[in-house]
Amino acid sequence: HFDGSDINFKTLAGKNFKSSFREHFRFSKTYDLPGTMDVEFEIFDAYFKKIIPDLKLRLYGSEDRPQSRPVVRDNLKVDAEDNSSRNVTHPLIYLSLKRLMPIAERSKYSLNSEEVEYFTRISREFTITNNRLLGKISGTTVSKTTGTIESAVVHGNNYDHESVSVGEDNTGQILMALFSFQKLKEEYVDYHGGILLIDEIDAGLFPA
């Protein structure tokens, strides 16, 4: 948070609403050296309701790690003593291609009893949205799963979470991310929207 206070809200997968550079990029010790990246960009900060016109992203050296460290500079300051070298304050969920790992290849996979009350409340809306996305009407029950990947899957009365397809599981992960933002909006008074990044969103969107 920009004022240094902790924001302890979690997604329905039990993670923080943020994504680190290492989830998106792998920097080379040989070629990605300090000073070799100099990016300037502009973004609208919904929290401050202002455009940040001159944000800079550069690579810097670090004594405690072999790779260069990406740092954002020239962010907005609340007062003169604030540090402008900070990331933009905005809730974010990133779903990588790891979400498409087949259930049979996951070392751990089981039902998850966390957030049962919330999932019970949204189960009808979750199921309807899932069926609409996959073009099916057989989905009737939501099961939250845990293990190698956190997910929530919709299945019918004649099979359970053990037998769902990659498409059903992938759709469940996407919906769980969307409903995570809905839950955050209900609980966080300073909510101003969020960002959902999905790597190759069309991959795996098939019902069986």
Task: Please describe what each predicted stretch is.
Residues D199-I201:
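Walker B catalytic acidic pair
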Residues A208:
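Contiguous mid-protein beta-loop-alpha structural module that forms a pocket-lining wall or clamp
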